[in-house]
Amino acid sequence: MTEMIEGRNAVLEAFRSGKCVDKLFILDGCQDGPVRTIAREARKHDTIVKFVPKERLDSMSETGAHQGVIAQVAAYDYSTVEDILKKAEEKGEPPFIILLDNIEDPHNLGAIIRTANLAGAHGVIIPKHRAVGLTATVAKTSAGALNYTPVAKVANLGQTIDELKEKGIWFVCADMDGEVMYRQNLTGPIGLVIGNEGNGVSRLVKEKCDFTTAIPMNGDIDSLNASVAAGGLAFEIVRQRMAK
């Protein structure tokens, strides 16, 4: 389960011992020396910091003695992008990576990790900010896939795409206005980019992609759930790879 660490000393030691802290919650207006020290550690580790009212901290606290700070620690350890590339290399396969642009719903993230595993993707990449991390809900929804599928967390998704392009990976972005997926070549080293539940892939990330693709739809509404879209596109990649 996601671990909540409460109290100033405990939170500070969590950072200093190298625990992966997803979010740090600090009491609104709390600016004394120990809290500033904790906030510095959070910035050093690129942890999301949220200032919240006392009522929020009290409702999150299990001990009733949070001292104005609570840290949310990831339920699972994160991998690195290099770990994902190494997995592809070890399997002798062209890399297949799913990148998620600001997915906020833990059920969607868990479902996408499950899909990634079943589709043979070598890993999933998520951003550090404005996105859900590896919570207990994500782990449960993944139905065990999180134990086998590397998930890397990066500070800048666009920059990561640029770096992976230098390694020969092409990037396709899910977009309603893209070319129908059956008409595109989705074989070879590929990164599939799936966007936020409400807004899709952000403009800056979309501009980094080599092309856009769409799932053909014939219904009365205009969009799929993020995890469903990821599944449809991921298994089109599987189909094309198997047909080669």
Question: How would you label these PLM feature ranges?
Answer:
Residues 1-87:
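N-terminal positively charged helical leader segments and presequences
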Residues 7, 108, 223-225:
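Active-site helix-initiating loop/hinge in glycosyltransferases
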Residues 12, 140-145, 203-244:
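Structured adenosyl-cofactor binding patch, chiefly the S-adenosyl-L-methionine
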Residues 13-19, 36, 89-179, 183:
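RNA substrate-binding interface of SAM-dependent RNA methyltransferases
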Residues 53, 74, 101, 127-128, ...:
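Short beta->alpha connector loops at strand-helix junctions that form conserved
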Residues 60-74, 145, 150, 154, ...:
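Short basic, glycine-rich beta-strand/loop surfaces that mediate nucleic-acid
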Residues 172-225:
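Active-site/ligand-binding-proximal alpha/beta "capping" segment
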